[in-house]
């Protein structure tokens, strides 16, 4: 992806970009009462480092370098209304998240980004081809809509795996299209994924099946009894 390639190029030029002239992790980060490392809510991005880790020169160098994503990522989000969030998870456990949602205050000190499904799916053991990985659709509590995550492995020029670039995308457009489809005079379309999870179902189709959105919300499996 373009965004993943941008992250790779930044890391390949880390020695030139890590000076902290634009943004300096050593000055910008502080510990919360939970011990998590946090940054100001007024900044463009959220930074999270687990509370059990110290802010080392290695952290500072990488964070200062990747802060240059501030110049491209907000514009990508603005140009793609269905994109909910863009983030980078590093192999050391650090997270840089757009937009700024005060991430460090939302997750526990032992939160391990490297164990998240989207990170694991793009990591070398699960993704030897180094291609983009797509999640199954899931219901997002914040937006109350279906989301998919695309994750892209980030390797530097030496071939070292540095982390995963992720993006959450809403499926609003496809659900609206399916909801507006008519089959014959009275029929309605609905959409399932390969695991029979509901992606889109209009109210009339729910009624035809004799079920309700509360019993079968989007993202849930439509069982054979239905």
PLM-predicted stretches and their roles:
Residues 77-172, 176:
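Extracytoplasmic/periplasmic ligand-binding sensor regions of membrane-associated signaling proteins
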């Amino acid at each position: 992806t373009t965004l993943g390639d941008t992250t790779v190029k930044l890391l390949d030029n880390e020695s030139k970009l890590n000076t902290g002239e634009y943004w300096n992790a050593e000055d910008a980060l502080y510990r919360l009462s939970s011990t998590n490392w946090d940054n100001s809510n007024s900044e463009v991005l959220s930074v999270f480092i687990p509370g059990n880790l110290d802010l080392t020169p290695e952290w500072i160098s990488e964070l200062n370098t990747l802060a240059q994503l501030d110049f491209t990522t907000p514009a990508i989000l603005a140009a793609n209304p269905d994109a909910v969030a863009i983030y980078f998870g590093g192999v050391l456990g650090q997270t840089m998240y757009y937009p700024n949602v005060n991430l460090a205050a939302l997750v526990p000190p032992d939160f391990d980004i490297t164990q998240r499904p989207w990170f694991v799916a793009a990591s070398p053991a699960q993704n030897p081809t180094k291609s983009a990985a797509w999640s199954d659709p899931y219901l997002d509590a914040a937006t109350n809509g279906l989301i998919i995550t695309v994750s892209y492995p980030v390797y530097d020029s030496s071939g070292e795996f540095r982390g995963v670039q992720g993006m959450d995308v809403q499926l609003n457009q496809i659900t609206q299209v399916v909801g507006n489809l008519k089959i014959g005079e009275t029929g309605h379309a609905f959409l399932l994924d390969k695991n029979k999870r509901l992606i889109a179902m209009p109210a009339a189709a729910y009624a035809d099946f004799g079920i309700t959105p509360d019993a079968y919300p989007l993202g849930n499996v439509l069982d054979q009894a239905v």
